[in-house]
């Protein structure tokens, strides 16, 4: 059992869990957000960033949805069992833009230009070729 006041989970013996659990899914679409109910298997573990499929006929939207947040009571959690959930927050997969990761090279504070030779020794630039990779 999950306590809605303190948030702790207690083990209760003899309690039968139903086969299917109805959980509310709030879909945050750009044009038209909507609420939908989905039936999940008892004991199914859901996590943020997982995909969930809703009924195309009832939602009118055929794209898979990405779980953006899971809500238990008033708390948002990264993962939860189906029977603990109050609300699943989701967005259509085609409305999510993934940030491009740019490869950023940092220059070392001690560049070859700062290395000077002392009497009778050669500089690093005589043995190494400086290549610009940008």
Curated annotation (Swiss-Prot):
Induction cue: Induced by nitrogen-limited conditions.
InterPro entries: Znf_CPxCG-like (IPR012041)
Record flagged with keyword Metal-binding: yes
Disruption outcome: Under nitrogen-limited conditions, mutant shows a considerably changed growth rate and a prolonged lag phase. Level of NifH is significantly decreased.
Keyword terms: Activator, DNA-binding, Metal-binding, Transcription, Transcription regulation, Zinc, Zinc-finger
Positions of transmembrane segments: none
GO molecular function: DNA binding; zinc ion binding
A Pfam family per the record: CPxCG_zf
Entry annotated with the keyword Signal: no
Zinc fingers classed as C4-type: ranges: 3-36
Function comment: Involved in nitrogen regulation. Enhances the transcription of the nitrogen fixation (nif) operon under nitrogen-limited conditions. Acts by binding to the nifH promoter region.
PANTHER family hit by this protein: UCP015877 FAMILY PROTEIN, ZINC FINGER PROTEIN
Oligomer status and interactors: Interacts with the general archaeal transcription factors TBPs.
Protein name: Nif-regulating protein A
Lineage: Archaea, Methanobacteriati, Methanobacteriota, Stenosarchaea group, Methanomicrobia
Primary gene name: nrpA
